[in-house]
Amino acid sequence: MSEATPAGGAYPRVDMSNGGSTAFPALEENVLKYWEKDGTFNESVASREGNEEYVFYDGPPFANGLPHYGHLLTGYVKDIVPRYQTMQGKKVARVFGWDCHGLPAELEAEKQLGIKDRAGIEEMGMRSFNEYCATSVLRYTDEWKEYVTRQARWVDFDNGYKTMDPGFMESVMWAFKTLYDKGLIYQGFRVLPYSWAEHTPLSNQETRLDDSYKMRQDPTITVTFPITGATEGTASVKTLAEHPELADAAFIGWTTTPWTTPANLALAVNPEVTYAAVRIGDDAAGADGAEGMYGKTVVLADDLRGAYAKELGEKAEVLGTFTGAELEGMTYEPLFGYFAERAGEKASAGEGSEGGEGNQRKPGAFRVLCADYVTTADGTGVVHQAPAFGEDDMFTCEAAGIDLEIPVDMDGKFTSLAPEYQGQLVFDANKAIIKDLKAAGRVLRHQTIEHSYPHSWRSGEPLIYMALPSWFVAVTKFRDRMVELNHEQIEWMPSHIRDGQFGKWLEGARDWNISRNRYWGAPIPVWVSDSEEYPRMDVYGSLEELERDFGRKPASLHRPDIDELTRPNPDDPTGKSTMRRVPEVLDCWFESGSMPFAQKHYPFENKEWFDTHSPADFIVEYSGQTRGWFYTMHVLSTALFDRPAFKKVVAHGIVLGDDGLKMSKSKGNYPNVNEVFDRDGSDAMRWFLMSSPILRGGNLIVTEQGIREGVRQAMLPMWNAYSFLRLYASQPAQYDTSSTNVLDRYILAKLRDTVQGVSDALDNTDIATACDEIRWFCDALTNWYVRRSRDRFWAGDAVHPEAFNTLYTVLETLCRAAAPLLPMTTEVIWRGLTGERSVHLADFPKSENLPADAELVTAMDAVRAVSSATSSLRKAHKLRNRLPLPKLTVALPNASALEDFTKIIADEVNVKQVELTEDVAQVGGFEVVVNARVAGPRLGKDVQRVIKAVKSGNYTVDDAGVVTADGIELQDGEFTRKLVAAEPEHTAEVSGQDGLVVLDTQTTPELEAEGWAADRVRGLQEARKAADLQISDRIHLTLSVPAEKEEWARTHADSIAKEVLATDVKVVVGEQLSHDVADDCSADIVVASVAS
């Protein structure tokens, strides 16, 4: 038996298990206690004082709810990058912040207080409500701190900021005033997404946030608008005169929002589209009462007649066609009489006249307008215009001089302007409106559709679009500059977001509605005169300016204190009017976007620092923030400073439950975070999340098995290597890279490559690749280096100090390289090895301090790949590893580079002979086979071209295995690689080496005997352990075997004796002895000499 007695005792230099459990969760708890007591985090920042700073923005969460997996994922990234940059010598402040204002805070407070609507807030009182909000938003700060701390995330809570802090709010005031002075803020009346449930408009980007669009069933109707005449001076006068068939015709228009029809004031057609006047056949089928439509003439886009074939009937007759431009100015009968007085007055020239030149009116409502946005993609090509409820409608009607009417109040209910529906929520009124329109014979079609519809991102109620007065940032004025800065100065991961998800959003950016009709938020710092006779508006950007004009500072910048600041209007000579603050507060996204400068109370403090440390070096959040925080920061930084807010951004994907769906507490489709921490530890969770595709923009399914992979891939290999060193080291090893042993040289050179790879990856914030580098190295360390070096370690550090020094050097360096990725596991190992204060106070290793040997690394990696491929063949043929085989043929393009390693290969895969050849083609190869069924839908007719190219050999396969045939790159699943070899069942591909191995599996009695003996050695070693022998105890061995195996046993008795430390071996036949060795063998073991 070659293994010696473990010496041990040299390690750990510091025992972070405190003599207790060495399970990872228990060790992590000890690390966290140590860091808190030691002040390690503060020291890591203070020790870099005066060095170059690395600026990182930590997006502020709300503390009125508990953290979830999304926060966990982002938090790990926010910890890894600063840890790495700190170890690279930079000072990295990690200030934690809290979002406090806005709808999320108000709605949670309402929920806690049992308030159901705005009236409840008014009854409670604005001051009391806001005071409650101020407390509520920090309700879960302790839980957040515990959560963040448990995940080993280092942040500065003590010096953190809150968006409700006076300093932060004053900086926000400054931003508003600065934008206003630049002409980039204005008050306008626009159609906006409006939440009737929350009584406030929202911004366009808020309607693009997660969960904002939901599937919803709504009624759709196609209604008639009977033509009544023409508007004087328009093309329709001539059209009506030349086409008498239009005299009794009606336009038909389609809408998915029947509740908007009481506010209809116009119709829109496309001037370039051809429209048809169609007489409905008597075989038509339509909505209830549609039989009353038989023989009537309707006007719709000619291309859409087929979409209404059922309602028009097979006997329908086209009476004439016209362009939209020829229809412009035609007047029609309103659907409802609510605003009938808005129709144009009859023109004097048309009074009493006949035909097309009669029935003329002056321009007014209820006429046809031309608009380029009208299409024939759906509907009828005639669009009903309700300018109070549609942005395009509003612009079109404004241009035509048609003022809007708003028959809906701030509760989303009809007002007295639509008396039949007064008090009804607009969505609830749909049913009654459709019923009334049917009774009037105006409905041609009535259906129900399921469509994606915007909902409030907080309350979940469906939004309406409604014309409202609001304050806007004029984003369209500097949109091109935003696009330019994004393209030229921001690095995205994944890179496609720059010109894709984010870039396209910027290109279509609209003016940003920043006012909210709410209570708890930063005030819009605008005061206006309450007199229309003496108008005046003042905008303020600081507390000092407020004190200058109002003679005092407000008790706080929140409502109602800020609202109480009033003063006489300086422009009113009568002294009767007063300057009062406008009631709105700012969109909380405006505050989040102000975070880079507002957290520093810029420009009132830290001006020089911010001016020289902006943009930030790095930020991270999930990809949906391209519509949220990423966007608002970019808007404000571009407008205020003409520079981006950040240089580099990671936009990660979404964490999904184990069923591939959104995480849900009710479904229980994800493992409890605290249970994972208790069972596997935070480092395991960190590794699972950080090594996944989610950081490259993909989504990730969280499973318990996946999390445990983190333990298997990196934590256990590192720990096992450290434990191996602890077990056998009798004295502390040294940092030494001078060993000439080939395995030592390999692992040190491999470590050099790994350190460089991790550094390159983390420099690029490519954390998943950094994890790959560590994982690959851990495999080489434990599954190759330590295993192949066991004999040297068993011999002890007095005999092979170079092995112990090398392993110490590797572990010490690996701990520093992996510290940002596995902060607690590496802390335990590193302190155990070195006895020093913390691995996180050390410098990141430099690859140039390790020996380079590219040829050796390449050759040994090939040896490992050959061994792995051979092992897979053994498994396929169910040939146990201890059974020697006659021959292995290794066919590689650079096989000659392995000549010095054939003994290692032979020993590793247990073959008697290793033959090398560089003629791979003679052994076999791979054919590419195109999967036409999969590739066909994507490639279309090109699939045949690809198949032909592959069959003729006109294709390439790159290092990543990507196949390109005749210039067309094939995707995963569109092809397979088929092994073609003389002995395919004995041949395997050598991964990553463009080669093959061929294993001769023919055995001989001699080989069988040798394998049989090796199996018995294994059984005897287990028997020694069962007998509680020391590793170095020598024994007298009696081995009982079947008669047919007696010759094998006697032939290999000496080799068996050597392996199990037997001074002598007695072979007997057919006896049952005290220790079972195998199915057919037993043994008696008597100690010959006891180890001292």
Curated annotation (Swiss-Prot):
SUPFAM superfamilies with a match to the protein in the record: Anticodon-binding domain of a subclass of class I aminoacyl-tRNA synthetases, Nucleotidylyl transferase, ValRS/IleRS/LeuRS editing domain
Enzyme class (EC, first level): ligase
Cytoplasm found in the keyword field: yes
Binding residue positions for ATP: 665
Cofactor: Zn(2+)
Pfam family membership, one: DUF5915
Motif interval(s): 'HIGH' region: 61-71
Keyword check for Transport: no
GO biological process, one term: isoleucyl-tRNA aminoacylation
Record InterPro entries: aa-tRNA-synth_I_CS, aa-tRNA-synth_Ia, Anticodon_Ile_ABEc, Ile-tRNA-ligase, Ile-tRNA-ligase_type2, M/V/L/I-tRNA-synth_anticd-bd, Rossmann-like_a/b/a_fold, tRNAsynth_Ia_anticodon-bd
GO molecular function annotation: aminoacyl-tRNA deacylase activity; ATP binding; isoleucine-tRNA ligase activity; tRNA binding; zinc ion binding
Chain intervals with Basic and acidic residues compositional bias: 554-574
Disordered, as annotated region: 554-578
Catalytic reactions of this protein: tRNA(Ile) + L-isoleucine + ATP = L-isoleucyl-tRNA(Ile) + AMP + diphosphate
Short motif ('KMSKS' region): ranges: 662-666
EC number: 6.1.1.5
The entry's keywords: Aminoacyl-tRNA synthetase, ATP-binding, Cytoplasm, Ligase, Metal-binding, Nucleotide-binding, Protein biosynthesis, Zinc
Cellular compartment(s): Cytoplasm
Cellular component terms per the entry's GO annotation: cytoplasm
Sequence similarity: Belongs to the class-I aminoacyl-tRNA synthetase family. IleS type 2 subfamily.
SUBUNIT field: Monomer.
UniProt domain comment: IleRS has two distinct active sites: one for aminoacylation and one for editing. The misactivated valine is translocated from the active site to the editing site, which sterically excludes the correctly activated isoleucine. The single editing site contains two valyl binding pockets, one specific for each substrate (Val-AMP or Val-tRNA(Ile)).
Entry-linked PANTHER family: ISOLEUCINE--TRNA LIGASE, CYTOPLASMIC, SOLEUCYL-TRNA SYNTHETASE
Protein name (Swiss-Prot/TrEMBL): Isoleucine--tRNA ligase
